[in-house]
């Protein structure tokens, strides 16, 4: 137990343990076919658990490679073939479920290497370092505020402390009821912080997830502030694979599913889904698959398109169809720029700094 954990306990910080509800039977009584639509983190995680329990699972992924936004694919360059990716992705240490899945690829998680820092880079102000903080609250937050060059004591005195209290009082129901109709931009404006502190200490929570604070729910920002800073004992510490994602994650997980009797099929888009006697008919451009159970592990635009193309789902799965609009509209395919209301461009580190493959290629 670290000193920050001890201090937290002394002032009343306690862990809140959630009962996962048992997790179901360790094995199905007899093999039953299931189809998982989507081969990203959600789909492959579902396939791993189902295959281990004896389900005859088939993963159907529309792209030629697994992983979605965490995917990797080969690119032919003048100097040879290089694995390409969507950018730098690291795994925070409170990602317990995901790390449990990754242990199927490597029981020791030896392929994950710690990233030593978490620098916030700005075109206008000096670097702000979010790394190397005590892991446990409230010591991590206090240390960040005390050492930050972006926030002075006079700034804290002029801040609207009542407006800031919701950042410290996250609740999975009450926070969304109160703040989901307020933007993160409005919440940050109410704090009365100087531009530098706002951009370097708070807007980073929206920019790190490719959101602009003017279009992001204030409840989501409060949830992120809680989950990454105040709501876990691991702190802002994370690791990244020492190989590209395809080599380190997706190929081993696909082999794990296949070892347990499952199949992983890429380059196969699902076009429609129909209820049939005894299960479902999952149609693809090249044919189809019959399954007793179906897991839809798609992003919101793909899910909405599949539901629209499958009109019989309204009667077969009315709850699913009713929930689809709540997932939001598909975002425009535009180039993201981390530009806040202050006109300050910020970003978190460099891809080549954390990815060994990219670092080697840049040399």
Predicted segments, located by residue:
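N-terminal Rossmann-like FAD-binding beta1-loop-alpha1 element of flavoenzymes
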Residues: 30-59
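Mid-domain catalytic core of redox enzymes
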Residues: 2-14, 30, 268-363
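Conserved Rossmann-like nucleotide-cofactor binding loop
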Residues: 42, 65, 301
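Short, flexible hinge/linker loops that cap or flank conserved catalytic cores
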Residues: 26-29, 143-145, 288
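Mobile amphipathic helical/loop "lid" adjacent to a hydrophobic cofactor/ligand pocket
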Residues: 98-99, 103-104, 109-218
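Conserved FAD-binding subdomain of flavin-dependent enzymes
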Residues: 77-112
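Helical element adjacent to the flavin cofactor pocket in flavoenzyme catalytic cores
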Residues: 224-285, 289-293
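Glycine-rich FAD pyrophosphate-binding loop
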Residues: 51-76
């Amino acid at each position: 137990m670290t000193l920050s954990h001890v201090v937290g306990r002394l002032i009343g910080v306690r862990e809140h343990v959630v009962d996962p509800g048992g997790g179901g039977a360790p094995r199905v009584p007899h093999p039953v076919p299931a189809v998982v639509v989507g081969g990203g983190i959600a789909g492959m995680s579902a396939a791993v658990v189902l295959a281990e329990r004896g389900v005859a699972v088939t993963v159907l992924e529309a792209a030629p490679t697994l992983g979605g936004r965490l995917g990797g694919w080969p690119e032919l360059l003048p100097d040879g073939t290089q694995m390409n990716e969507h950018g730098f992705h690291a795994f925070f240490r409170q990602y317990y479920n995901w790390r449990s899945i990754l242990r199927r690829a490597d029981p020791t998680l030896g392929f994950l290497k710690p990233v030593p820092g978490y620098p916030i880079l700005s075109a206008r102000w000096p670097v702000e370092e979010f790394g190397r903080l005590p892991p446990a609250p409230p010591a991590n937050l206090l240390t960040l505020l005390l050492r930050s060059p972006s926030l002075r004591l006079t700034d804290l005195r002029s801040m609207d402390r009542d407006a800031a209290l919701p950042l410290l009082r996250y609740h999975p129901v009450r926070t969304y009821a109160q703040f989901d109709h307020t933007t993160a931009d409005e919440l940050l404006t109410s704090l009365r912080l100087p531009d530098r502190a706002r951009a370097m200490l708070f807007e980073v929570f929206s920019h790190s997830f490719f959101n602009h604070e003017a279009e992001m729910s204030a409840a989501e920002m409060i949830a992120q502030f809680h989950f990454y800073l105040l709501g876990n004992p691991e702190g802002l510490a994370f690791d990244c694979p020492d190989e590209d994602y395809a080599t380190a994650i997706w190929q081993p997980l696909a082999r794990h599913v296949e070892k347990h009797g499952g199949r992983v099929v890429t380059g196969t888009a699902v076009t429609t889904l129909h209820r049939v006697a005894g299960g479902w008919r999952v149609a693809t451009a090249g044919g189809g698959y019959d399954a007793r159970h179906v897991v839809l592990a798609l992003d919101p635009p793909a899910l909405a398109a599949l539901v629209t193309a499958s009109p019989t789902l309204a009667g077969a799965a009315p709850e699913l169809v009713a929930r689809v609009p709540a997932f939001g509209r598909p975002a425009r395919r535009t180039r993201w720029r981390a530009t806040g209301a202050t006109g300050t461009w910020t970003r978190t580190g460099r891809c080549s700094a954390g990815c060994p493959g990219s670092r080697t290629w840049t040399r």
